[in-house]
Regions:
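Membrane-integrated ABC transporters
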Residues: 1-29, 36, 44-59, 65, ...
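Transmembrane helices of ABC transporter permease
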Residues: 10, 14-27, 38, 58, ...
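Helix-loop-helix
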Residues: 47-57, 147-161, 175, 231-304, ...
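Pre-NBD coupling/linker segments of ABC/ABC-like ATPases
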Residues: 314-329
Length: 586
């Protein structure tokens, strides 16, 4: 929580001016009943029209000044709250960008979206209301009691008795309801997460005819949220009727006591009206204060959740100064030395004691069953994750010695799921290289077999993509994603099963084009299909996180049982020939 105060400190002036102008408004609010009392006791009682008009003018003037004070307070409170929320949102977003995939996996996407949007909006609302009302309500209550004593001491005692009872009623309800609001927020998070998951996976849900189950699951979570909201609502609903009953009882006592004072001549009718108005001001402000405290408690809870995200330390630390990229030694592009890796919270290792060397310019194929660790292995090269033990070397230097920019410039990654951003094709291609020329973009598109795709669009490079490239097919998105990585001409290119949506002919052309890249480009091909990696200079065979085999296709057919089984599962007609020849299948 203290860490969030830093952002409000940037708006010290606004945070001081807003409450001050609210206090000025309160002063005029407290004077209004006294002026009304004078109009009744002097103007109306004495049939003094000029006096009534003059006091009416004073009321209009006070209302105008109070309105100006209110507008000023609102302006500065809004400026402080919006500015603080904007800086806080930016800080959280910047911090998220600095987190490694390990922290992102632990926190979860749904949680981060909720913190960035809902929680920070709640913090903004709390700051706004706090600056405007946190001092106003107590000051009105205290000021009304003081003003009541200036009118009549005996009647003011009714205020002293009523206010503590009102406080107990109002804040008693709050003490019960505030903890429940945290449960409501947690239930809302679950509903939000389920909504996002269902919307993202709506095609899968319909493909498996799981609509009814999804509706049932959502209904269960939604009913839980509704139940909590209704329970809290019932408790909170007691606030207004209970306080109004108390205030009406107090008003009856006040009027009775004031009537006695009027009968003996120690009070005038206008003063009775003033006391009643002060009583009404107190109840209104107590209800406002109760609502404010509920809002502030929600804001504090949300602020703690946001602060929790900011407090998550990143395990991915980069050196402040570069230079590792210049220290190229030997012909080894990528080296794994006894590398093991375990995902946060996982019981078993995803990779265990992996060692191999990929020379500069080689094509490395990676194959294995589902969950064997293929994507995890290549993620360590680009340092999406850090190895639990062992060393990952790029050009003879540990990846931890590279700055983020150096490693990003050296390694190009195309992941399994093709992600394109809203904007033109040219804009998306320049993610790989900001100053890329059209010629460089077309060269990359040609290599990625995407030239025909772009040429077929009316605006070609200026063709506007929808969010996540929804106006393209799966294969088109994959080819554009590959082209985006190729634009910057990376020294290490990682294709993580990124051609799964391509037809066989296009995939073959792509493999050939990638194989003909510049001599110093080292390519990692992750694939489920042996045809996609058969011609690789080196093939890594993974099984349950261990390196089961390493070599060329011919070598692995002789030495690696796992590789042979994968091969024969995809080419069953070759098994008989292999058994007959007991040799290598060309």
């Amino acid at each position: 929580m203290k860490s969030l105060g830093v952002y409000l400190k940037h708006y010290k002036k606004e945070s001081i001016i807003a409450p001050l102008f609210k206090l000025l408004e309160v002063v005029f609010d407290l004077l209004v009943p006294m002026v009304v009392a004078q109009i009744i006791d002097v103007g109306i009682a004495g049939n003094n029209r000029p006096y009534i008009v003059s006091r009416f003018g004073i009321l209009v003037l006070m209302a105008s000044v109070g309105l100006c004070c209110s507008f000023t307070a609102q302006y500065f409170a809004a400026k402080a709250s919006v500015g603080c929320a904007t800086e806080l949102r930016q800080a959280v977003f910047d911090h998220i960008q600095a987190l490694s995939f390990t922290e992102l996996d632990t926190i979860g996407t749904d949680t981060l979206i909720t913190r960035l949007i809902n929680d920070i909006n709640q913090v903004q609302n709390g700051i706004n209301m706090g600056l405007r009302l946190l001092l106003r309500s107590p000051f009105i209550v205290f000021g009304s009691v003081v003003m009541a004593f200036t009118v009549n001491v005996k009647c003011a005692i009714v205020f002293l008795v009523t206010i503590p009872i009102l406080f107990v009623a109002v804040f008693g309800i709050m003490l019960v309801s505030i903890p429940l609001f945290k449960k409501v927020q947690a239930a809302l998070d679950r509903v939000t997460g389920m909504t996002r998951e269902n919307l993202n996976g709506v095609r899968v849900i319909r493909a498996f005819c799981r609509e009814e189950q999804s509706v049932a699951d959502f209904e269960k979570s939604n009913d839980e949220l509704t139940r909590l909201n209704e329970f809290v609502g019932k408790i909170s609903a007691l606030l207004n009727p209970l306080t109004y009953v108390l205030i009406n009882i107090a008003a009856v006592v006040l009027i009775w006591q004031a009537g006695l004072q009027v009968n003996i001549g120690s009070m005038q009718q206008g003063q009775v009206v003033a006391l009643y108005n002060y009583m009404l001001q107190i109840i209104v402000e107590l209800i406002k204060l109760a609502s404010l405290i509920i809002t502030l408690n929600k804001s504090v809870a949300c602020a703690e959740r946001v602060s929790g995200v900011l407090a998550v330390p990143t395990t991915m630390n980069y050196p402040a100064k570069g230079g590792a990229a210049k220290k190229v030694t030997g012909d080894a592009a990528v080296t794994f030395k006894n590398v093991s890796f375990t995902y946060a919270g996982a019981g078993a290792e995803s990779l265990s004691d992996i060692s191999f060397t990929a020379k500069r310019g080689q094509t490395i194929g990676i194959i294995g069953g589902t969950g064997s660790g293929k994507s995890t292995l290549v993620s360590l090269i680009s340092r999406f994750y850090d190895a639990t033990s062992g060393d990952v070397m790029v050009d003879g230097e540990n990846v931890k010695n590279y700055t983020k920019e150096e490693l990003c410039n050296k390694v190009g990654v195309v992941q399994q799921k093709a992600v394109l951003f809203k904007g033109s094709i040219r804009d998306n291609m320049k993610w790989g290289k900001e100053d890329a020329t059209d010629a460089e973009i077309w060269e990359a598109l040609t290599t990625a077999q995407a030239k025909e795709v772009v040429e077929g669009k009316q605006d070609q490079l200026d063709f506007m993509l929808e969010q996540n490239g929804k106006n393209l097919s799966g294969g088109q998105k994959q080819r554009l994603s590959i082209a985006r990585a190729l634009v910057k001409k990376p020294e290490i290119l990682i294709l993580d099963d990124s051609s799964s949506a391509l037809d066989f002919a296009t995939d073959a052309k792509l493999r050939k084009a990638v194989h003909n890249l510049e001599e110093n480009t080292t390519t990692f091909l992750v694939s489920q299909r042996i045809a996609g990696i058969r011609q690789a200079d080196q093939i890594l065979v993974l099984g349950n996180g261990t390196l089961e085999g390493n070599g060329t296709h011919d070598e692995l057919m002789k030495t690696c049982e796992v590789y042979r089984e994968i091969y024969f599962s995809q080419f069953p007609e070759e098994r008989a020939a292999y058994n007959n020849e007991s040799g290598v299948i060309a």
